[in-house]
Swiss-Prot record:
Domain USP: 202-1083
Protein name in the entry: Ubiquitin carboxyl-terminal hydrolase 1
Binding residues annotated for Zn(2+) 1, in chain numbering: C32, H34, C139, C142
Role: Recognizes and hydrolyzes the peptide bond at the C-terminal Gly of ubiquitin. Involved in the processing of poly-ubiquitin precursors as well as that of ubiquitinated proteins. Is involved in resistance to the arginine analog canavanine (CAN).
Reactions listed under catalytic activity: Thiol-dependent hydrolysis of ester, thioester, amide, peptide and isopeptide bonds formed by the C-terminal Gly of ubiquitin (a 76-residue protein attached to proteins as an intracellular targeting signal)
GO biological process: protein deubiquitination; proteolysis
Residues noted as binding Zn(2+) 3 in the record, renumbered to the chain: C95, C98, H119, H125
Keyword Zinc-finger set for record: yes
Family: Belongs to the peptidase C19 family.
Molecular function via GO: cysteine-type deubiquitinase activity; zinc ion binding
Keywords for the protein's UniProt record, in alphabetical order: Hydrolase, Metal-binding, Protease, Thiol protease, Ubl conjugation pathway, Zinc, Zinc-finger
EC code: 3.4.19.12
Organism: Arabidopsis thaliana
Length: 1083
């Protein structure tokens, strides 16, 4: 811990080894007045001679000091105790005023916790000299180096020459050997500054979110080839980028940055921004993009300068040009070979590269299992809620202050004592009372136990209470009945867009009948809340609905067969549905508040359907929807017709009617009447065959059947209010079930099979909204996220740079849309067509030869229009246009027989010159062309001019043909999806200090030197996309030492640079980092 604190203090100090020439330059500018005043050379020489060895006096007195000594141990323990263990790592300094040896920094003695600083604080002695490097002579008061010599009689003489000789005689090996070893391994903060040609690691000032720029520049400044070029070459005539980069290299050199902790790269950054304006401002950018823009700018600038100066390294007839500096340092070449799998023809292309961008193997995280679905599955499997269990009690809905919190504020599930022992978050209600007498006189026979309306927008969540049975009876005199539903507890961390969850209460909504769908499975009631104005994507336009009609005498329990919710795909037959009162009827989101003698007009060309609620007798109409997608036949069974699309709103239509009031319909439309009477019934039959012009699109709402895989992926949570409708997906049907005394059941199995046969979905439907919450504003909340984070794919082996290179250079099969245009196969197809053409031409000419052995050119010209048909008859195939893909271009004859090839409208060649042949009667006719070769060549050219493209499956392989001096490897950690969202692939990718590219090189490569590289630096990105930071690791030290220690794995000195902060780092720390860009130098 003490050593870590010492290292951290060094980050803000200026300690460095200075060469003799530069120290002279610095001391000429600064003269110290304290040397002549406080240094007594004779006294100092005597003290130095009295010491036999050079050791730190404080470290030695740690063992032998007495309490009554000159400064007292108690006064020194606050500063020397933390540095005793590191004395062997530090240099020894001699106080020029008292001759006392103390240990301190390797560079300048400015570390606060060092013994030399403690000696200065206690004694106020100002002047010290370093024993290992006597050129370092420091004055604490002036904060500068002392002059080496003084001019006397026109000659320069070193005033401390005798002192330096005595110091070198005092057993210098006693400390220098151990110091060299410890210093090389410890990685002091300025250990890289060892000689005039060594690289001095300095921090770079952050100009405002420019860490992406600083991290790249730290690595470029550490590259030996670039530094030698910019420091030694004469670049007086250059562009702004080259000039500013040269100045930055000069400032970072150890000879020019002794007294500077950091460098301001303002000029270079502004030069880059002038050519790449996207880096302006104070926003974060990609460091790899900055690197490419900088290197391209330097290369373009150098090429432009060559053209202006007229520099040419080649003749006019040669296209060779001397590569630029960037091309010679970073430029490499890859070979891309594509070979046809059919004929073996291959093509090789050489492409230059500045860096290798390697894709990192990754995989998507599996979606989190949602708590509500897993618990519901357990309930349905184990039957946790018994048949005789009571309904969960709640306060009346009329009490506005009472709430049943859907999401408790303490993030814990509220206990419900009415449920069974195997209690879950999903509350299942059972045993709804068969009879619920009503005080309302207009046929309302049963009140729904209740449903919770929870409308969830991004930050808005409300909940409605569940009314008790007797409290509901007490409130039935009102025109409206409050509705409530299930309370589903979902992990708040998985709910998207709802960071704050509040409890609220709601009461009955005046002027609207509120009712929710009720589903029952084996005496277990599951309330499924829904709402009507829910819109999904454009492809989800078909809708369906569920309507219920109730009678008075023996109301049935309505339920959906929900046994296959998450279990085996069993579908029960003969569902019974809960009867609803007249005021509670909803058809496709349609809401009719009607009393006796109310009439609602129907859509265009449609019939009507009437509902009758009686105290003595009831006849229930229902819809046979088994043939929904069959031929448009007229249904023989009466059902209730929803209005046309023009009469409904987006979620369904809502017709509010009063007594003796009729809503006019469209042209040619019938009406639907609702009559409430004690003795009479009137049933209308509806022709539903022409309701939809396109039967695959339906706009009637329903709970869309979802497969188990869809539910497990994102799940559903339908939280909506009364009179709300859920839209379904495209091509989906709806269900319209009714129940009453004279109940006629629909074949549920047939109905669901038709749905899934037409949609091609799973056989295990789960009724609910779609799995993705694409309309969270409508009330649906998805538990899973669309952008799941990606992780490194370590299923086969740990991810490493070698594995990425192997993935980059492995064979790739090009097929289907990516099939390769094989020139050899295209040429063979042309030749095949030419041969076939000549073969048919020869057969045709032999057929028309006359008896004298001379062919009749006249007959040939006369019958030229029939040649094509004759060819077709002889060869047995019709002429076809050029085929782009053949199964085998080698087997020519089989291709012809199979009809894969043909020729286009072959025309007879024009007769350019003819010979006069005397015939009977002295007449002459044109004979064969004088030049048959000319005619044939014309036809051959016509065939050759046809553009024939044959695409074949091919194999592609990419290898490195030329290895660059500096290999830059870019790991693709950032990706962008189709929606433009950028994500980061976090995780450690294994890499080594040395890398060999031999197995990734092209076998025809003629390079003699082995492509072995050593790590020179890297760029690492920390954090996430929104709040990230770039840092860099740089290999420092003397160039000659680095070159001589290439075979030693731990001989490097590494530094960690984060903008202006620079600290030493070990090689183990470097290899543990999550590298983004790697820089390797060839050895």
């Amino acid at each position: 811990m003490r050593f870590a604190a010492t290292v951290s203090e060094k980050q803000s100090e200026q300690s460095v080894e200075v060469t003799e020439e530069f120290a002279v330059t610095m001391t000429e500018k600064r003269s110290c007045v304290h040397f002549d005043k406080y240094v007594d050379l004779d006294k100092l020489l005597k003290i130095i001679k009295s010491y036999q060895q050079i050791k730190c006096g404080e470290c030695n007195e740690r063992v032998h000091v007495k309490r009554g000594s000159r400064w007292g141990a108690s006064n020194r323990r606050d500063w020397y105790s933390s540095s005793d263990q590191n004395c062997a790592r530090n240099a020894i300094w001699l106080c020029l005023e008292c001759g006392y040896y103390v240990c301190g920094d390797v560079g300048l003695p400015t570390e606060a916790q060092s013994h030399v600083m403690g000696h200065n604080r206690l004694t106020r002695h100002r002047l010290v000299i370093q024993c290992k490097n006597p050129q370092l002579r420091w004055c604490f008061s002036c904060q500068s180096l002392l002059p080496f010599d003084n001019e006397e009689n026109g000659e320069k003489k070193d005033l401390l020459l005798e002192v330096v000789k005595l110091i070198r005689e005092r057993s210098p090996n006693t400390y220098s050997a151990s110091f060299e070893t410890e210093f090389s391994c410890s990685g002091s903060i300025y250990g890289g500054i060892e000689a005039r040609d060594g690289y001095a690691v300095r921090g770079l000032v952050n100009l405002g979110n420019t860490c992406f720029f600083n991290s790249v520049m730290q690595n470029l400044l550490s590259l030996d080839q670039l530094r030698e070029h910019f420091l030694k070459e004469d670049l007086s005539v250059s562009g702004p980028l080259v000039s500013s980069l040269k100045e930055l290299f000069a400032e970072s050199n150890s000879e020019a940055s002794v007294f500077r902790n950091e460098i301001n790269p303002r000029d270079l950054f502004f030069s880059v921004c002038s050519q790449a304006p996207q880096f302006r401002g104070y926003q974060q950018h990609d460091s790899h993009e900055l690197l490419r823009c900088l290197l391209d700018g330097l290369s373009i600038e150098e090429s432009s300068l060559r053209k202006k100066l007229g520099v040419s390294d080649s003749n006019d007839s040669s296209t060779y040009q001397k590569p630029t500096l960037i091309d010679s340092v970073f430029g490499g070449e890859i070979s891309s070979t594509v070979s046809c799998l059919e004929c073996g023809h291959f093509s090789k292309v050489y492409e230059p590269f500045m860096d290798l961008s390697l894709p990192v193997p990754s995989m998507k995280l599996p979606p989190k299992k949602q708590q509500i679905l897993s618990q519901a599955k357990e309930v349905l499997k184990n039957g946790a809620v018994s048949k005789d269990s009571e309904v969960v009690s709640a306060k009346p809905a009329s009490d506005h202050n009472s709430t049943v919190p859907l999401f408790p504020s303490d993030h814990k599930i509220q206990s419900r004592p009415e449920t069974s022992d195997n209690e879950t978050d999903l509350v299942l209600l059972s045993d709804v009372s068969d009879t619920a007498p009503s005080t309302e006189a207009k046929g309302v026979n049963q009140i729904l136990v209740g449903s919770t309306e929870t409308l969830m927008h991004d930050n808005d969540r409300t909940g409605k209470t569940v009314p008790d049975k007797e409290d509901v009876r007490a409130t039935q005199s009102n025109e409206e009945t409050s509705a409530s539903g299930i309370s589903a507890v979902i992990d708040e961390a998985q709910v998207c867009g709802c960071p704050d969850l509040e409890q609220s209460s709601s009461s009955a909504n005046q002027g609207a009948d509120e009712e929710l769908a009720l589903m029952v499975a084996d005496s277990q009631v599951l309330y499924m809340p829904y709402k009507d104005h829910l819109f999904y994507d454009d492809y989800m336009v078909a809708e369906a609905s569920s309507s219920f009609v109730s009678g008075d005498h023996e109301p049935k329990k309505d339920y959906f067969d929900f046994s296959s919710f998450l279990d085996e795909p069993e579908i029960r037959e003969g569902p019974v549905f809960r009867p609803l009162s007249k005021s509670e009827v909803y058809e496709a989101g349609f809401k009719a508040d009607c009393s006796d003698d109310k009439t609602v007009s129907a859509g265009k060309g449609e019939a009507s359907s009437s509902f009758i609620s009686s105290d003595h007798e009831q006849n229930i109409d229902y819809v046979d929807f088994s043939s929904f997608f069959d031929e448009p036949e007229i249904s023989e069974r009466p059902f209730f017709r929803p209005l046309s699309k023009s009469e409904v709103s987006e979620a369904g239509f809502k017709a509010d009617c009063s007594d003796d009031k009729t809503v006019s319909a469209g042209k040619g439309e019938a009406s639907s009447s609702f009559v409430s009477s004690d003795h009479e019934q009137n049933i209308d039959y509806v022709d539903f065959s022409s309701f939809f012009d396109e039967p695959e699109i339906s706009e009637r709402p329903f709970f869309r059947p979802l497969s188990k895989s869809e539910v497990s992926e994102a799940g559903f949570m339908a939280v909506s209010g009364n009179d709300k409708t859920v839209r379904a997906g495209k091509g989906e049907t709806f269900s319209s079930f009714m129940s009453g005394d004279n109940e006629r059941n629909i074949d549920y199995v047939e109905f669901t099979n038709r749905i899934f046969d037409d949609r091609g979905t799973s056989e295990r439907p789960v009724f609910g909204p779609p799995s993705k919450a694409k309309v969270s504003e409508a009330g649906f909340v998805a538990v899973s996220s669309d952008s799941d984070p990606a992780v490194l794919d370590e299923s086969d082996s740990p991810v490493s740079v070698d594995r990425c290179l192997a993935q980059f250079t492995k064979h790739e099969i090009l097929s289907e849309d990516n099939a390769w245009h094989c020139e050899n196969c295209s040429k063979n197809l042309k030749l095949q067509r030419l041969r076939e053409k000549r073969r048919t031409k020869e057969g045709l000419s032999n057929r028309w030869v006359n008896e004298n052995g001379a062919s009749s050119a006249f007959d040939e010209c006369r019958d030229s229009s029939l040649n094509q048909s004759c060819i077709d008859l002889e060869n047995g195939y019709k002429a076809a246009p050029p085929i782009t893909k053949l199964p085998n271009c080698k087997e020519e004859e089989s291709a012809i027989d199979d009809g894969f090839v043909g020729e286009e409208n072959t025309k007879q060649a024009p007769i350019t010159s003819v010979t006069e042949t005397p015939l009977l009667g002295g007449e002459t006719i044109s004979s064969q062309p004088a030049s048959d070769n000319e005619c044939e060549n014309w036809e051959d050219l016509a065939v050759d001019s046809e553009e024939v493209i044959v695409k074949r499956d091919a194999r592609k392989k990419v290898l490195i043909n030329k290895a660059p001096p500096v290999l830059t490897i870019h790991l693709k950690r950032f990706s962008q999806d189709a929606r433009g969202r950028v994500s980061k692939l976090s995780g450690h990718v294994d890499f080594q200090e040395f890398i060999d590219l031999s197995k990734y090189m092209d076998t025809r490569c003629s390079e003699e030197d082995e492509p072995v590289y050593r790590l020179a630096g890297l760029v690492e990105h920390l954090g996430a996309m929104s709040r990230g930071h770039y840092v860099s690791y740089i290999r420092g030290g003397h160039k000659e030492r680095r070159d001589s220690d290439t075979k030693e794995p731990n001989s490097s000195i590494w530094y960690h640079a984060s903008d202006s902060q620079v600290r030493p780092a070990s090689l183990e720390e470097v290899l543990r980092s999550e590298a983004y860009i790697l820089f390797y130098e060839r050895i």
